[in-house]
Amino acid sequence: MYNIVVPDPKFISFQKLELNDLPLMQKWLNESHVHEWYDKNEKNTLEEIIKRYGPKISGEKPSDEYLVLYEKEPVGFIQTYKVNDWPEFADYVGYDDHAASVDLFIGDISFMGKGFGSMMLNKFLKDV
C-alpha cells in the first residue's frame, strides 16, 4: 500500500490481464469500495472470477482487460469493449455502431480520493 499525497501520471502504465492476475482481481472485487459499484450482484469466488474473466483474457469474448500499474505495481483495473459486442448491455444503454465503453476501478484504496481515477483514464486513452 502506498502513502502518496498526489500520484504522478508518468508512473502509470497498463498490462494485459492474465489468468495469474485473477486472485488479485478476486481480492479487489470483494473490497467494499469496489464491490459497492462493480460487479456488485456477482459472486466473487475465484471460480466465478475465472468464469467471468477467463474468456475475455483468452479472446473468446470481445473485451480488452488491463491491470493498472503504478511504479510497476498493480493498483487498479480497466477494460474496454465495443458496446454492440454485448447486446444485453447495448439494449440497456442505447448505442450507435461505433460506441465503446470503458469500465475501471481503483483496487488499492490508498489511491482513492486523489484524482487517480481520472488520471488513469486519461493516461489509458493516450497510451492504449
Language model segments and positions:
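Active-site rim helix/loop that mediates acceptor-substrate recognition in acyltransferases
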Residues: 42-63
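Hydrophobic alpha-helical core bundles mediating ligand binding, dimerization, or RNAP-core interactions
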Residues: 26-29, 53, 102, 121
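Conserved beta-hairpin
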Residues: 62-82
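Conserved acetyl-CoA-binding loop-helix of GNAT-fold acetyltransferases
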Residues: 113-127
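Helix-loop element at the rim of GNAT/NAT acetyltransferase active sites that forms part
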Residues: 27-44
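Conserved N-terminal entry element of GNAT/NAT acetyltransferase domains
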Residues: 1-19
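TRNA-binding/sensing appendages of the translation machinery
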Residues: 23
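Conserved acyl-donor/pantetheine-binding loop and adjacent beta-alpha core of acyl/acetyltransferases
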Residues: 79-104, 108-112
